[in-house]
Amino acid sequence: PKSFQKNPIPGTKFTIAISSAKGGVGKSTFATNLALALKKVGCKVGLLDADIYGPSLPKLFSINEKPESDGQTLKPIIKYDIQCMSIGFLTDEQTPMIWRGPMVTSAIKTFTQKVAWKDLDFIIVDMPPGTGDTQLTFAQEIKIDGAIIVSTPQEVALLDVKRGIRMFD
């Protein structure tokens, strides 16, 4: 089997992934509230919206601007003293994201390696629902210090949660 070298996201101490097996369970709301709570207790926090197909951070934080770039790196947008990045900052809200796996993987690598995250105690990663290319890229390449799986209490949903937990092991 192939061995993967997992690296931390540059400029960060701890990476916390917020994931779910299904959409619409409150994952993005939880991720933003966790980021705000950590900020409130004095931590330096970043929030990465890794949901390429359905980014919600621009709406949740009312961000309508585009990040600055020096041609090599993207500068996170600061809102509520939290460093933020989302594909939603780079595309029009009406533009459908019809990307295949390699494009998604490339975008995730850009957000984890080419964003100028600065001196963060925590970066909260709002993952898309399910176990697709985004989750695989993170699980294989990024050092994840903790994962929180958000779910509803139905038995079938909890079975999916167990599978999701194994992915981050």
Name these PLM-found stretches:
Residues 9, 54, 71, 101, ...:
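Amphipathic alpha-helical transducer elements in NTP-driven molecular machines
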Residues 44-99, 105, 112:
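Phosphate-binding loop that captures ATP/GTP phosphates
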Residues 14-51, 165:
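Walker A/P-loop phosphate-binding motif and the immediately C-terminal alpha-helix
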Residues 1-21:
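Extreme N-terminal, non-catalytic leader segments
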